[in-house]
Amino acid sequence: MTRVIVVDDSAFFRSSITKMLTQDSEIEVIGVAKDGIEGLEKIKNLKPDVVTMDIEMPKLDGISTLKIIMDEMPLPVIMVSSLTKEGAEATLKALEFGAVDFIPKYPGNSLASMDLAALSSDLCTKVKAVAARAKRFPLKRIRKDKVPIISPVKKDFFTSPNHSERSRRDIIAIGVSTGGPPAVQKVLSELPETFPACILIAQHMPAAFTKPFAERLNSMCKISVKEAEHGNPIKNGIAYVCPGGRHLRLDLKGALPQISVVSEPSTALYKPSANVLMESVGKSMGGRSVGVIMTGMGSDGVEGMRVLKSKGGFVIAQSEASCVVYGMPKAIVDGGLADEVVDLDNIAERVASALYK
């Protein structure tokens, strides 16, 4: 049984989230709280496996509460966020401070304003997945004043004797879901502005979140990071984030690769889809590509990666121990597709090395 505490200042959302969670017989809501102070007291006394946390609350807001949890009694926290630019920015900050994931809070105080069945299934799956992961790999304390340690790929890596010639590969495709934003931030922030490849990212995320995500990455990285637009050219030292609710493809216009932002296939389980991205990169770039699958639930990316690998692409999967949820990378490893399985701390360096393989 997975034990959960729900923290939200809205009685409606406390009730709604509790109803969603208790649809699953393997989840028990052991307490609710209307603000961060009450939430901290109940967390200390009841010791849940997972907490859902609203961001905007009186007395003590969600991010301040999260910082205390991760400093004093680390456990998986799933943020509940409004679908606004401000909500997106606060959520991305919460993920950086240790939250494992988030679910959107739709406007309106009626169950009709939500796709309750889909939200319930998604939330219950996330709760059980992060609880199971925390039991195998307990979360570490994150001090409130901690500065992230960055081990950048040095500029001279690309001018050393082993890498002085033009790299063989110049397109990096990344597929990622649960736990992705801080993981992607870590990888991209370690790359130099002279990085000799273009990076395409399919991060499972709502449409309201992807532009703030790209802007936040751009402010923290030496390379440029942008939300992708249809027709963007491929350039070294730039990372493109696929807009939420759309797909990112790489297509050849004559001999030149060009980004396509499209709605089809509409039947894809996820939008953005790692499968769509990987398949298009494999077909258009073949041996010039590196595919990277990072933390996330499910198996999105595995079919597209089969195409990429069959066309000569190099495949990297994130290690189980460094994932928030070991689903998407596990599918790559179990499918025999991974050329390397790499801890998060080493992905930037291994991606840089893969350009020359």
Swiss-Prot record:
Involved in chemotaxis. Part of a chemotaxis signal transduction system that modulates chemotaxis in response to various stimuli. Catalyzes the demethylation of specific methylglutamate residues introduced into the chemoreceptors (methyl-accepting chemotaxis proteins or MCP) by CheR. Also mediates the irreversible deamidation of specific glutamine residues to glutamic acid. Its EC number is 3.1.1.61, 3.5.1.44. GO terms for cellular component: cytoplasm. It catalyses: [protein]-L-glutamate 5-O-methyl ester + H2O = L-glutamyl-[protein] + methanol + H(+); L-glutaminyl-[protein] + H2O = L-glutamyl-[protein] + NH4(+). The keyword Repeat does not apply. The keyword Phosphoprotein applies. The modification 4-aspartylphosphate is found at residue 54. It is found in: Cytoplasm. Residues 165-357 form the CheB-type methylesterase domain. Phosphorylated by CheA. Phosphorylation of the N-terminal regulatory domain activates the methylesterase activity. InterPro entries: CheB-like, CheB_C, CheY-like_superfamily, Sig_transdc_resp-reg_Me-estase, Sig_transdc_resp-reg_receiver. Belongs to the CheB family. This is Protein-glutamate methylesterase/protein-glutamine glutaminase. GO terms for biological process: chemotaxis. Residues 3-120 form the Response regulatory domain. Keywords: Chemotaxis, Cytoplasm, Hydrolase, Phosphoprotein. It holds the Pfam family Response_reg. Its main location: cytoplasm. GO terms for molecular function: phosphorelay response regulator activity; protein-glutamate methylesterase activity; protein-glutamine glutaminase activity. The active site is at 177, 204, 300. Contains a C-terminal catalytic domain, and an N-terminal region which modulates catalytic activity.
